[in-house]
């Protein structure tokens, strides 16, 4: 009764109006699962391959019909007949069917869509929530959210190099309260921006994208919004950055060139100067997490950054690790970073996603489950964060339904868990000494 009888993919649109995949899996019992695949704007060069059509006459070359056809004509034939509950076997079968190290033949987007849909169908068959199916009986930790309320870099047209300015309501007693705090700060920030005559349009991830006078102006404005909402920076609410440094790293000159986003007169920094600058910000502001502070291939820089700041903040590897256990293992061995960002489409299956989370935890690294800038209404990452007891999630600002869908799912999960639910706040940053 739990045998897969049909797999079907279609092309749908993501939050940027670009094509992506939606996959449906059906079983003999009538149990059903659907998965939708996100897409990134600033992507690591070592990520699994997102297969696009390249036909400029259709969606500007971004169509996903090749990936859809791979699901319907190749993958479906391979997985029909499997027990839908055998997630690892199905994921491994798809990896073997692709046969490349980066899923470049079938496409990580094709494989991931099936992987998510299989898990959802299994949960439906067992009549249990997805987080319970993926995580088992010890699932209980609601993640501390990192809310991207200012969008810069490749996620907006704002003249700021850093891609994300985040608030982290780690002092809240519950996830529900953390979400409320974040929403109140978001609206307080909007009022401040309006009072300054700055734009309140939002970027890809729902954060504002105003023309600040540099990074520190953005930080100071966020701190003012936290206080205006009635909260205390550094006690109730902390700050975080996604620098996305690879987006403005000049490989030929080996410098971090802020002029790419901030224009003429902006800083151009060596690796050591980049670390000095980040340390200045950490010493001045209540920053608790810095993602991709160095270029994805700057291993020496990552090691120095971790040595300097790894006890004060969590240096998080996103483009640096690309949710891949091979890169993570190297990072652990070389003492680079102390946290990994988890993006399901960077690696392409749920099995490999959980492998990366487990490896991180065993090494004392934290795992931050994350969305992509091109999202859908699919809320699977909310269930993954709870299933893995990851303790941290990054899923955008307090606007745009593609972001709110994940927050609302976490509210449902918190309700379902009842008294068992734990919101650990600062304790989720167990890799820090402060």
UniProtKB/Swiss-Prot annotation:
- In this protein, the active site sits at 205, 343
Q: What class of enzyme is it?
A: lyase
Where is Mg(2+) annotated to bind? 242, 291, 318
Q: What is its main location?
A: cytoplasm
Q: Could you give the cofactor binding note from the entry?
A: Binds a second Mg(2+) ion via substrate during catalysis.
Disulfide bond residue pairs: none
One GO term under biological process is: glycolytic process
Which GO molecular function annotations are given, in alphabetical order? magnesium ion binding; phosphopyruvate hydratase activity
Membrane-crossing residue ranges in chain numbering: none
Its pathway?
Answer: Carbohydrate degradation; glycolysis; pyruvate from D-glyceraldehyde 3-phosphate: step 4/5
List where in the cell it is found.
Cytoplasm; Secreted; Cell surface
In the Enzyme Commission scheme, what number(s) does this protein have?
A: 4.2.1.11
State the protein's name: Enolase
Q: What keywords sit in the KW lines?
A: Cytoplasm, Glycolysis, Lyase, Magnesium, Metal-binding, Secreted
- State the reactions this protein catalyses: (2R)-2-phosphoglycerate = phosphoenolpyruvate + H2O
Question: What does the similarity note say?
Answer: Belongs to the enolase family.
Q: Which GO terms describe its cellular component?
A: cell surface; extracellular region; peptidoglycan-based cell wall; phosphopyruvate hydratase complex
Q: Where does (2R)-2-phosphoglycerate bind?
A: 163, 343, 372-373, 394
CC cofactor: Mg(2+)
What does the record give as the function of this protein?
Answer: Catalyzes the reversible conversion of 2-phosphoglycerate (2-PG) into phosphoenolpyruvate (PEP). It is essential for the degradation of carbohydrates via glycolysis.
Q: Report which gene this protein is encoded by.
A: eno
Family matches, as NCBIfam families: eno (TIGR01060)
């Amino acid at each position: 009764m739990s045998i897969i009888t049909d797999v079907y993919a279609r092309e749908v649109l993501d939050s940027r109006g670009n094509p992506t995949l939606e996959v449906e899996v059906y079983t003999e019992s009538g149990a059903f699962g659907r998965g939708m695949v996100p897409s990134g704007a600033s992507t690591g060069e070592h990520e699994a391959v997102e297969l696009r059509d390249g036909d400029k006459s259709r969606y500007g070359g971004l169509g996903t019909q090749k990936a859809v056809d791979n699901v319907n004509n190749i993958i479906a034939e391979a997985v029909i007949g499997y027990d839908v509950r055998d997630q690892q076997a199905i994921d491994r079968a798809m990896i073997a069917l692709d046969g490349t190290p980066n899923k470049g033949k079938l496409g990580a987007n094709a494989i991931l869509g099936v992987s998510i849909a299989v898990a959802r169908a299994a949960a439906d068959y067992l009549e249990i929530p997805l987080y319970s199916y993926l995580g088992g009986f010890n699932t209980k930790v609601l993640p501390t959210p990192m809310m991207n309320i200012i969008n810069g870099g490749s996620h907006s047209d704002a003249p700021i190099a850093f891609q994300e300015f985040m608030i982290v309501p780690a002092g809240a007693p519950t996830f529900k309260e953390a979400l409320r705090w974040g929403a109140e700060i978001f609206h307080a920030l909007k009022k401040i921006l309006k009072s300054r005559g700055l734009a309140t349009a939002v970027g890809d991830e729902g954060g504002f994208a105003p023309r600040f006078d540099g990074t520190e102006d953005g930080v100071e404005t966020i701190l003012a919004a936290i206080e205006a909402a009635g909260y205390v920076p550094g006690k109730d609410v902390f700050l975080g950055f996604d620098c996305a440094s690879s987006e403005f790293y000049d490989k030929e000159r080996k410098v971090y060139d802020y002029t790419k986003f901030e224009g003429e007169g902006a800083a151009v920094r060596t690796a050591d100067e980049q670390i000095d600058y980040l340390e200045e910000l950490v010493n001045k502001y209540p920053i608790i997490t810095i993602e991709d502070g160095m270029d994805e291939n700057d291993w020496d820089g990552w090691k120095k950054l971790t040595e300097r700041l790894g006890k004060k903040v969590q240096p998080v590897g996103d483009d640096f690790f690309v949710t891949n256990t091979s890169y993570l293992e190297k990072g652990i061995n070389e003492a680079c970073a102390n946290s990994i960002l988890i993006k399901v489409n960077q690696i392409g299956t749920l099995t490999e996603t959980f492998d990366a989370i487990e490896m991180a935890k065993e090494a004392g690294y934290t795992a931050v489950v994350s969305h992509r800038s091109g999202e859908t209404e699919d809320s699977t990452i909310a269930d993954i964060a709870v299933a893995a007891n990851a303790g941290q999630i990054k899923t955008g600002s307090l606007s745009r339904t593609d972001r709110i869908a994940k927050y609302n799912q976490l509210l449902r999960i918190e309700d379902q868990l009842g008294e068992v639910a734990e919101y650990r706040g600062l304790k989720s940053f167990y890799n820090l000494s402060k």
